[in-house]
Amino acid sequence: MTKAVLGIIGGSGLYELPGLENVREKRIESPWGEPSSALRIGEIVGLPIVFMSRHDKGHRLSPSDINYRANIDVMKRAGVTDLISLSACGSFKEELPPGTFVLVDQFVDRTFGRASSFFGKGCVAHVSMAHPVSPRLRLHLAEAAEAEGIPMARSGTYVCMEGPQFSTLAESMTYKNLGYSVIGMTNLPEAKLAREAEICYATVAMVTDFDCWHPDHDAVNVTDIIKVLMANAEKAARLASRLARDFPREHEPCPIGSDRALDTAIITAPEARDPQLVKKLDAVAGRVLKGG
């Protein structure tokens, strides 16, 4: 079996990972451009951990400016087998108040203008996104949250907007009426790219606000979000520590095939593939491309 390496991408308010030991900082070059930050590579209770700050220290990158392809590519190059996204979000449900964590199991993509695939002209691939989140990772996260006494909803639909502006009231009411659970700006195309890279992926959506639909709460603003982020960051650190303590040391095969997503995805014939694109795909798709 393959050794498990847990990747963690920290969103707003999570620029470091408390509890990470034997840390070394490493910058890995990517053919897809510059990733958000250097990787902080270490361990928690003996489990190899690779941490990245999605917005970088000081929050210098907006959601639309993040190079999602480079981020996932360097995670793959660092040997990550399982990837956890810790992300701030707004809530559309009374039962998911600020401070609640949500184990997302579905996504709706409302972004535009972001590169959403490693593949394209010269090497076309179509991976399944029917079930975008690893059920195995969600189970491990749920058990860790329960052990730490962290309020956690075990399912929910995350709608990803482009940003950087927050929702209009009409948008917020539309998403609420459609039954979505939370809203954020970063988990897509991240989840899609993780699937293309055959990395098992799961999101912990950390609720900071009620967006702007709630009649008894003010419209979302950065000042209020930051206050909740501080409390959420402490819980996220405890969650990561407990998850690492109980996480299998050998990578478990994904029950939905996330780690074999490219087995039947690439449709371009070998002789029609663009050599330059194939070269860029060496980390992401080398397992299947090197065989022809």
Language-model regions, residue ranges each:
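Metabolite-binding pocket within alpha/beta catalytic cores that recognizes anionic/polar moieties
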Residues: 1-130, 286-292
